[in-house]
């Protein structure tokens, strides 16, 4: 299995769900072993490069934000990262003229469409995988996420919300190639009772029914067209998990189980993995 990048650049415009700012984003091809690199094109006075790595994650409140040593940051990268993972793109340069990745429709599907339009190019370097060698678990109150050694990637994820519109949902997933058809179009969601508070804190400035599922205080789905799936909520949480795990630099080969996961928990798991060199190794496809 070889590494891959895009055949040609592809661009989009959109607003940030939290900043409310309109930005242009371009995904460009990159050389072998580059990984995923973000560049803030609106900043030229200092280092504007940020590697999409777990160790550059600086904030996990409602989304995943990465920063560099110069405190240049880009937020809400997880939906784009999930699309890159789902399309098996190992190397890409992402140029953006603002502080936040556009939310698009609240899912990864628009980014998947962009990548498919650009096309994929195989490269002259072997693809590497992060193989887990021992059990690793992170817990915060009643939320937990753990991974165990396994010969391929499989995920069992459960969410549990007090809202009757969501409730308890479970989903298992084991085929990366089915991400684009079954997970990528699951949208982010939020509660109207929290909107005023979030906006008072400078968050959710760009939120609308065009880019998120809205749930009111009577547990009613407010979007005119309803849900895309009965279990769209857990599908989106799985999407978030894949996007966050891709900040490891590659696909994780492990049996993963999560309960009430979050961006913070996802990132903590990667820190826990990489803090112990005996818990993982990078392998090629022939070594799986």
From Swiss-Prot:
Q: What does this protein do?
A: Catalyzes the hydrolysis of UDP-3-O-myristoyl-N-acetylglucosamine to form UDP-3-O-myristoylglucosamine and acetate, the committed step in lipid A biosynthesis.
Which segments of the protein form a coiled coil according to its record?
none
What family is this? Belongs to the LpxC family.
What keywords tag this UniProt record? Answer: Hydrolase, Lipid A biosynthesis, Lipid biosynthesis, Lipid metabolism, Metal-binding, Zinc
Cofactor list: Zn(2+)
Instruction: Note the superkingdom of the native organism.
Output: Bacteria
Which residue positions are annotated as catalytic?
A: 263 (proton donor)
Q: What is this protein called?
A: UDP-3-O-acyl-N-acetylglucosamine deacetylase
NCBIfam families hit by this protein: lpxC
């Amino acid at each position: 299995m070889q590494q891959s990048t895009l055949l040609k650049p592809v661009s989009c415009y959109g607003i940030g769900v939290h900043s409310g700012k309109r930005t242009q984003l371009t995904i460009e091809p990159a050389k072998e072993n580059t990984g995923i690199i973000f560049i803030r094109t609106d900043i030229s006075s200092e280092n504007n490069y940020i590697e999409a790595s777990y160790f550059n994650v600086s904030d996990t409140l409602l989304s995943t934000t990465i920063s560099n040593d110069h405190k240049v940051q880009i937020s809400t990268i997880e939906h784009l990262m999930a699309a890159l993972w789902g399309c098996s793109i190992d190397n890409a340069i992402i140029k953006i003229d603002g502080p936040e990745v556009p939310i698009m429709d609240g899912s990864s599907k628009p980014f998947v469409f962009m990548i498919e339009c650009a096309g994929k190019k195989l490269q002259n370097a072997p693809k590497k995988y992060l193989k887990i060698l021992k059990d690793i678990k992170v817990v915060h109150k009643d939320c937990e996420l753990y991974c165990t050694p396994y010969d391929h990637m499989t995920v069992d994820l459960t969410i549990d919300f007090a809202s009757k519109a969501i409730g308890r949902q479970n989903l298992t997933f084991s085929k990366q190639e089915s991400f684009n058809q079954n997970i990528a179009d699951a949208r982010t969601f939020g509660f109207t009772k929290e909107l005023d508070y979030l906006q008072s804190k400078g968050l959710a400035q760009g939120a609308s029914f065009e880019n998120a599922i809205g749930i009111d205080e009577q547990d009613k789905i407010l979007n005119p067209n309803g849900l895309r799936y009965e279990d769209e909520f857990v599908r989106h949480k799985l999407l978030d998990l894949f996007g966050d795990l891709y900040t490891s630099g590659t696909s994780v080969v492990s049996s993963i189980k999560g309960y009430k996961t979050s961006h913070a928990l996802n990132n903590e798991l990667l820190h826990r993995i990489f803090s112990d060199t005996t818990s993982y190794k990078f392998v090629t496809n022939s070594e799986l």
